[in-house]
Amino acid sequence: MALPWLQRVELLLFTAAFLCGALAAATLTRTQGSFGGNCPLYGVAALNGSSLALLGPSAPSLCYFVAGASGILALYCLLLLFFWVYSSCIEDSHRGSIGLRIALAISATAIFLILVSACILRFGTNSFCNSIISLNLTISCSEAQKTSWTPSGTAVQFYSNLHTAETSSWVNLILWCLALLLQAMQCKFKATSYQPQERGDQEWSSETDALVGHHQSHS
């Protein structure tokens, strides 16, 4: 059974959301790993001779939250895609009003989590970069990732990875907002499609009562 066109567009959005969420989670995890498991967001850099070092990292749970939220939502998108592909090929692909309400609640929660994660990435990266630039060793974060860090091998492409994670999160936010809009439209269409049926049932009931009453009066 073919899926409605609105739901097909919704699944395309979730496909893109899966890619964005997975990319954000992977790049942030890679950045945290390059700092030895420390979270550079809102961190403080310091000079160690002629090298840079992460002196005051944030709690690792901050990066875990951002990467975890992005990863879990990406996994949800992937499972949702598998479910609807299976349903459209094997079973009935109809989604009822209760399913739509649940989808709306999940989308609203996802939008909140992604918005919080994107803001953490934006302001956390800016705070860390400002602490680096204030040392007057480099003029930008993109240049700082080319500078030597202590310990050796630390901060490999950290700014590029953080920038990619942030951009992916903002794009992911837009995709989820569009998905929420499509789900709301499906709820509206489903509600309006029930009204003519209910009106028709009432007319049928009235006609039936009239016929029954007419038959009883003759008998």
Swiss-Prot record:
Membrane-crossing residue ranges in chain numbering: 9-29, 65-85, 98-118, 162-182
Keywords on record: Membrane, Phosphoprotein, Transmembrane, Transmembrane helix
Top-level taxon of origin: Eukaryota
Primary site of residence: membrane
Protein name as annotated: Transmembrane protein 179B
GTP-binding listed as a keyword: no
Residue list for modification Phosphoserine: 206
GO cellular component, one term: nucleolus
Keyword Transmembrane assigned: yes
Topology with respect to the bilayer: Multi-pass membrane protein
Family of the protein in this entry: Belongs to the TMEM179 family.
